[in-house]
C-alpha cells in the first residue's frame, strides 16, 4: 500500500537538532515532560511547513492559522507570529538546511501540575517544539496515485470538536486511517454528519467533472493551506471551482480526482 505521506528516507535526519522552548537538542535527546498537555491530552495545535530554496512556503498563512486555532481553544502563544517565524528559520539555519525540508511546528498548552484536563492546572508557558526533517515525497506516489475508500468514522460536528481545528488530538483521523488500511486502501475518504464527502484523513479531496473542479464546503475539514491555494489558482485562471456538498455517487462519476496537502502537494487518486 502507498500513502500520501510516503517519503524518501534520509540519513541526515539522524543528526538533526530539534527546537524545544528556545533551546536545541539532538534528535535522540529531544524530549518533553510526561506532564505536558500535548502528551497527556492532545491539548494543543500544530502546523506542517515546507522549506524550499531557503524559503518557508506560505509561512504567513501557516502562522495565522496556528494562531487562529490557538485562540479558538483559549491557548495564548507567548511568542508573536514574527518571533515564531524567526525561531523556525533559526532552526533550519542551525541544521544547515536549505530545501526539501518538512517542518512540524507544535504548540501545546504547557506542563500540568497533575494529569487533569482543566487548563487551570497548567503551570508553565505553552510548550513550543520545532521538528525539521529532510523529507522528499516518493516519486512513485505521484506517478501511481493513491487509492481511497469510504469509512464508518466521520468528521464530527462543530459542537463536538470543530473539525476545522488543526489540533494535536488526531484520533478521529487516525481511526479513519486504520479503517482504510484494514481494507487495503491507502487513505480514508471521510463523510460529514450529513453523509456528504468532507475530506480525507490526512489530505483534502478534489474531483473534476466536465472540466469543473469540486471540493467540499470546508465546514468539516481542516483549514488547509494547500487546499486554499488550489482554490485560489482555479479562480485566478478562470477555472470553474465549486465548494459545495456532494455525495459519494458524485465522486464515482468523476473524470478524475486528486488530494492536496503541505507535504503531499497534489497527488492523483487512482
For each predicted feature, which ranges?
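Conserved alpha/beta cores of soluble small-molecule-handling proteins
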Residues: 1-189, 193-194, 222, 227, ...
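Glycine- and Gly-Pro-enriched alpha-helical subdomains that act as flexible
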Residues: 189, 196-218, 223
Amino acid at each position: 500500500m502507498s500513502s500520501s505521506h510516503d517519503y524518501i528516507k534520509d540519513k541526515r535526519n539522524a543528526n538533526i537538532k530539534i527546537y524545544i522552548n528556545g533551546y536545541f537538542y539532538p534528535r535522540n535527546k529531544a524530549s518533553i515532560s510526561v506532564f505536558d498537555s500535548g502528551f497527556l491530552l492532545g491539548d494543543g495545535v500544530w502546523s506542517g511547513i515546507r522549506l524550499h530554496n531557503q524559503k518557508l512556503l506560505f509561512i504567513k498563512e501557516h502562522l495565522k492559522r496556528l494562531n487562529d486555532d490557538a485562540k479558538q481553544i483559549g491557548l495564548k502563544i507567548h511568542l508573536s507570529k514574527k518571533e515564531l517565524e524567526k525561531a523556525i528559520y533559526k532552526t533550519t539555519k542551525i541544521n544547515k538546511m536549505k530545501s526539501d525540508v518538512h517542518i512540524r511546528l507544535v504548540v501545546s498548552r504547557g506542563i500540568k501540575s497533575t494529569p487533569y484536563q482543566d487548563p487551570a492546572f497548567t503551570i508553565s508557558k505553552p510548550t513550543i517544539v520545532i521538528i525539521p526533517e529532510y523529507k522528499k515525497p516518493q516519486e512513485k506516489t505521484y506517478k501511481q496515485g493513491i487509492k481511497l475508500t469510504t469509512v464508518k468514522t466521520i468528521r464530527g460536528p462543530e459542537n463536538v470538536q470543530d473539525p476545522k481545528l488543526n489540533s494535536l488530538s488526531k484520533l478521529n483521523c487516525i481511526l479513519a486511517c486504520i479503517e482504510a488500511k484494514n481494507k487495503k486502501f491507502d487513505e480514508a475518504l471521510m463523510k460529514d454528519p450529513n453523509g456528504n464527502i468532507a475530506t480525507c484523513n490526512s489530505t483534502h479531496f478534489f474531483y473534476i467533472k466536465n472540466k469543473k473542479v469540486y471540493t467540499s464546503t470546508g465546514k468539516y475539514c481542516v483549514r488547509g493551506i494547500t487546499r486554499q491555494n488550489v482554490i485560489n489558482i482555479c479562480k485566478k485562471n478562470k477555472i470553474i471551482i465549486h465548494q459545495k456538498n456532494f455525495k459519494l455517487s458524485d465522486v464515482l462519476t468523476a473524470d478524475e480526482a486528486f488530494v492536496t496537502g503541505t507535504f503531499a502537494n497534489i497527488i492523483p487518486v487512482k
